[in-house]
Structures are given as C-alpha cells and as structure tokens.
C-alpha cells in the first residue's frame, strides 16, 4: 500500500496532502466549533452542512490521490482511506464490510465522539450522535474507492460514545438519486511568503517550525488513531472543513436573518476561535514539548507571545507575524496566506464583513492567556478560569482591521484593552 501523506510547503506555511491543505487543531476547537454550529439548528438546517462539507473534501482528495498514483485495486484504496483517517488523528475504522452498495463500519475509536464526551459529556436523548465529520469522510471515501459519483452515498451513525455506547459504528447506503454537492476549493486563493526570525525576540521562529513540522505528530495503530500531544487531542484537520461549515452557516444565517445573522455568526465563530486559543494555546504552553523546546528561549513575557506565534507558524494556518506588541496593552498581527481567506475567496469571492474568525479569536486569546490570565504561572485551564479571564476588567478585545476577502492584500488583527 502506498500511504497518502503530504508535505509541509514552506512557501505557503501549510501541509498539503493530495491537493488538500491540512492544519493542526485540537478536540477543544473541533467540538466547540461543532457545538457552535449546532446552536444555529433552530434557524437553519445545519446537519447536512456538517456531513456534506466533509464528503466533498474527502472525495476530491481520495480521487486525486488514486488518479495520480494509478491505484485501481479496491482493497488497496480501502487501506489508504483507513490509514489516512488514522494518521490524521480522526480515529480508527475498518472498511472490510463495505461494498459498492454500502455496508456497516465499526470504529475502534473516533475523535469527535471521544473528544465530545471528554469535553462535554453525554448527549441528551433527543440530540443526534456527534460524528458528522466521520459520516462525511466515510461517504466521500467510499464514493472515491468504488468510482461512484459524488453525492451517491449516504452515511448514518448507529452508535456513539456520547450515547454511552461502548463503540462507534456507522452504516453506508446508496442514494437512489445522487445529491448535488460541490467541488472542494482545495488550496484556494493562496499567497506566497517567507518566514523570517524577528530581531526583537530571542525566540527562533525558523527553528521552532523546523522542529515541530518534523515531529512525528500522527495517529498510529497502537493509539487507535488518536493523537495525544501538547496536552490536547490533536487532529491534522482539513482546513476547508472548518471553512465550508462555518461560511455555509454564515451565508444561511444571512439569508434568514440579514445583517443580524451576519453579526450572530461573527460573534459565534470568533468565540469559537477564542475558546480554541484558551485550550489549545494554553495546553501547548503548559506541555512538556513547550518546556523542552520553546520555554528556554523565553526571557520575557513578550517572548511567550512570540513563542506561541512561532508555534502557529508550524500548524499550517499560514504566516503569522507580529507587527506591534505593547506589553499588556496591544498586539497587532498580520496573517499572510491565512486558510480562512484562501477558502472564502475561492468559494464565495468578496465579503461585506471581515471573515477570519479563527484568527480573530485566536489573537485575542493569546493576549488574554499571557497578560490577563498569566499562563506563565501554569493555572488550571478550567471553564471557571475561562469565565474569570473573560469577565476580568483586564480582558482584551479584538478587531480585524484589514481583510483579504474585503479587497485588502493582507489580514491584520488588532488586540487591545
């Protein structure tokens, strides 16, 4: 079997695998973003968006990989899909019982099901099971494996850890009439750039990127496809999955609620980015990896800001550069080739509002963690601590002052008191 893998492309600061950009995010962001999207279910039909966005992306990626490598044998194609799912930290399943007509899939572990239960606990009886991404992955991969049309497979979830089941399982069936789905935006509208070491910090951005991008951060058979690293459960997730689900939600809210819908989407998605920063960046800055590699470079609290921004530059989110840092008062960050703008520009074109919600919430989270909450003292990253930070008179605000999707040549974020 030829495994599906990618390479970290330093001219884009992104990991590309068979045409699809993949980025590191953890279970806190994955599950909180999904919960955020689910909060709109009374206004829009969100569940097909959560499934079909994954289906489109996986179908495109698998088709490209099979075609480029002339892989025609069905069993090898199945092994490639199983292996890539595991490698990315999504979990572990077997397609042994899946045919061109569908079949049942039993998963030994599933990131979304396991991660949701870990973060939020069990779901209520009237709530659906949570592995929407996996349902889309299975449908798209099966279509590609058997040379079926995109939208011809349906996948439902039969059991889930969040329902107190002891395993996770799914069932694939063929649609009588194929759904009309869209093509993946793939890399989108990209920008080339070069990462440099700033001259106002002892933090070695290039060295950190080199070290982190060469670390074996991957799911394995022994870990059942779960990546436990930096104090969180990591995934190498499709950036287009975050973007397609988020922006489709945004557009649906705009259609149903007008400008109020846009404002609601902005608030929800920015908060998801802030929660991501609190848990992901906070977990990283308390991890053994941070203490061994990055903390020795940090002489001041400003170096901590540079340290976590250097880490972001290894996560595939594009190029993050600090333009201005006023201790405990202000942070200005420029993002080049940000995955949010890349995807939005390719699929939707120009926007009437700034759309880089993850970066917006993430930059705000950095300042709140380091200057408001003082992550250097190793606090417990609890919900209570998060509320304390958010309600503090020292809490930071953020605005996106430039946006590529609005016609600017870069994305700029200003965090301020």
Language-model segments: which ranges?
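N-terminal accessory segment detector
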Residues: 1-133, 147-358, 362, 372-398, ...
């Amino acid at each position: 079997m030829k495994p599906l893998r990618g390479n970290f492309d330093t001219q884009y600061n992104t990991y590309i695998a068979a045409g699809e950009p993949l980025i590191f995010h953890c279970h806190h962001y994955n599950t909180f973003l999904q919960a955020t999207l689910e909060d709109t279910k009374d206004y829009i039909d969100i569940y097909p968006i959560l499934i079909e966005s994954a289906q489109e992306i996986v179908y495109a990626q698998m088709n490209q990989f099979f075609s480029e490598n002339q892989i025609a044998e069905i069993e090898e194609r199945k092994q490639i899909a199983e292996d890539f799912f595991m490698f990315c930290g999504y979990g572990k399943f077997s397609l042994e019982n899946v045919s061109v007509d569908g079949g049942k899939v039993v998963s030994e572990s599933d990131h979304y099901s396991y991660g949701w239960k870990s973060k939020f606990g069990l779901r209520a009886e009237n709530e659906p099971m949570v592995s929407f991404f996996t349902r889309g992955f299975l449908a798209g991969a099966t279509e590609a494996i058997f040379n079926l049309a995109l939208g011809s497979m349906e996948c439902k979830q039969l059991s889930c850890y969040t329902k107190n089941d002891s395993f996770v399982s799914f069932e694939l069936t063929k649609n009588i009439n194929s759904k009309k789905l869209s093509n993946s935006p793939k890399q989108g509208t990209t920008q080339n750039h070069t990462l440099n070491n700033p001259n106002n910090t002892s933090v070695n951005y290039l060295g950190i990127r080199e070290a982190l991008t060469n670390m074996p951060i991957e799911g394995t058979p022994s870990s059942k496809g779960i990546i436990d690293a930096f104090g969180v459960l990591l995934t190498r997730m499709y950036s287009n999955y975050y973007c397609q689900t988020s922006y489709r939600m945004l557009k649906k809210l705009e259609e149903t609620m007008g400008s109020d819908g846009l404002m609601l989407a902005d608030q929800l998605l920015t908060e998801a980015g802030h929660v991501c920063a609190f848990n992901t960046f906070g977990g990283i800055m308390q991890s053994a990896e941070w203490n061994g590699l990055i903390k020795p470079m940090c002489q001041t609290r400003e170096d901590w800001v540079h340290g976590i921004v250097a880490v972001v530059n290894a996560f595939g989110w594009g190029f993050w550069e600090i333009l201005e840092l006023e201790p405990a008062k202000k942070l200005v960050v420029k993002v080049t080739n940000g995955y949010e703008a890349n995807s939005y520009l390719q699929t939707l074109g120009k926007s009437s509002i700034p759309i880089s919600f993850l970066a917006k919430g993430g930059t705000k989270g950095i300042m709140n963690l380091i200057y408001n909450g003082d992550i250097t003292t190793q606090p417990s990253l609890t919900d209570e601590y998060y509320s304390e930070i958010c309600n503090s008179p020292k809490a930071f605000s953020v605005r996106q002052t430039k946006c590529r999707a609005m016609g600017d040549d870069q994305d700029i974020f200003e965090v301020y008191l």
